[in-house]
Curated annotation (Swiss-Prot):
Organism: Buchnera aphidicola subsp. Schizaphis graminum (strain Sg)
Name of the protein in question: SsrA-binding protein
Chain's role: Required for rescue of stalled ribosomes mediated by trans-translation. Binds to transfer-messenger RNA (tmRNA), required for stable association of tmRNA with ribosomes. tmRNA and SmpB together mimic tRNA shape, replacing the anticodon stem-loop with SmpB. tmRNA is encoded by the ssrA gene; the 2 termini fold to resemble tRNA(Ala) and it encodes a 'tag peptide', a short internal open reading frame. During trans-translation Ala-aminoacylated tmRNA acts like a tRNA, entering the A-site of stalled ribosomes, displacing the stalled mRNA.
Family: Belongs to the SmpB family.
Keywords: Cytoplasm, RNA-binding
Subcellular localization, as worded in the UniProt entry: Cytoplasm
Alphabetical GO biological process terms: trans-translation
Main subcellular location: cytoplasm
The organism's place on the tree of life at top rank: Bacteria
Disulfide links within the chain: none
A GO term, aspect molecular function: RNA binding
GO cellular component: cytosol
């Protein structure tokens, strides 16, 4: 009798969009699947993907797409398949989720931004957020808060070592 090995069920992050957290206030975070071609999955497994400038928009009322995400084509991919590295990719969402996102996105200053791409079991998933843009003043304030958090951690470490 043969026993199957249990695969690791942890989700592993492929890439993160750190600029999104710097340029936007993230209000809500959502998760969806992606419709990918075979060569795209192979490239993503190798980590040849970039979602820094990517955003989400709806062409029809029933479908949402990921734009400006770049998946580098493999040099070993076949010749009869056209490899468009920056094509729009369909998101797998329920109809009520799409309607909810469209209503939220129609507010002034709101947009949907890709945050991270990760594996969940054997499926490639996308985390994206409903975001509002930051001004220069907001960016400076968030930098000051981050620096203060780092300073607090340093002080706490010093206090713990002294006791």
């Amino acid at each position: 009798m043969s026993y199957k090995k249990k695969r690791c069920l942890k989700s592993s992050i492929i890439c993160k969009n750190k600029k999104a957290y710097y340029n936007y206030f993230i209000e809500e975070v959502f998760q969806s699947g992606l419709v990918l071609m075979g060569w795209e999955v192979k490239s993503i497994r190798l980590g040849q993907v970039n979602i820094i400038e990517s955003y989400i928009n709806n062409d029809n009322l029933n479908e949402m797409y990921l734009y400006n995400s770049i998946v580098q084509p493999l040099h070993t991919s076949s010749n009869y398949v056209s490899c468009d590295s920056s094509r729009k990719r369909k998101l797998l969402l329920h109809k009520n989720e799409i309607q909810y996102l469209c209503n939220k996105k129609n507010k002034i200053g709101s947009t949907l931004v890709a945050l991270s791409l990760f594996w969940e079991k054997s499926w490639c998933k996308l985390n994206f957020g409903l975001a509002k843009g930051k001004t220069k003043i907001d960016k400076r304030a968030s930098e000051k808060q981050n620096e203060w958090k780092k300073e607090k951690l340093k002080i706490l470490k010093k206090v713990k070592f002294q006791n």
